[in-house]
Amino acid sequence: MKDSLIIVSGGMDSITLLYDKKDEIALGVSFDYGSNHNAREIPYAAEHCRRLGIKHITINLDFIHEYFKSSLLEGAEAIPEGHYADDNMKSTVVPFRNGIMLSIAIGIAESNGLQKVLIANHGGDHAIYPDCRPAFIDAIDKAATEGTYNNCKVVAPYTNISKTDIARIGKALGIDYSETWSCYKGEEVHFGKCGTCVERREALAEAGIEDKTQYKV
């Protein structure tokens, strides 16, 4: 039964969830909030939804770029290099991003008679992003249930697994990860040394997947 909406960025995690739950998904939603990499990743989200016959929409959140502070919104040169869990990567946090996107997605889901909102946060996000942690997901799920007539649910099946685990799921599903985007710098090709690139490389290697991604370094 197609009773779900998915927040789909075009990155490894959400594309894996898209294919993992394709038989349940009626609508894919991407958010353009003016980050360095939105223009690179959203086309992948749209294309994968098209291939699966799932309606896709993009919602513009320009106010985030105008009023919020994050290196993710300040140009490629502002993105720090290093491992995803390093303290300097906290500069890439867009405050309450998932809370904002989930709130909008919950409203869209109820408006379209859908029961669930899917999001692909994972265990590797916990160190940096408060709105990816289990306590937050539990809280916003409860808020969604209490705040909608149809008792909409927030479903985040990857919350307590690693990106490597997600890559293994994708491998079993036959996903070509070269048709996803991770790099926060948002240039012509993946940079290779920012936190998301490092994490991507590690996950693919640990999952035994040939990495066909083109990296600058």
Segments (PLM) and residue ranges:
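Short cysteine/histidine-rich metal-coordination sites, predominantly Zn2+-binding motifs
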Residues: 186-187, 209-217
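Local cysteine-cluster metal-coordination motifs and their immediate loop/turn environment
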Residues: 103, 179-202
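Short Cys/His-rich "knuckle" micro-motifs
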Residues: 204-207
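ATP-dependent adenylation/nucleotidyltransferase module used to activate substrates
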Residues: 1-174
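Poly-acidic low-complexity segments
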Residues: 60-63, 176, 190, 211
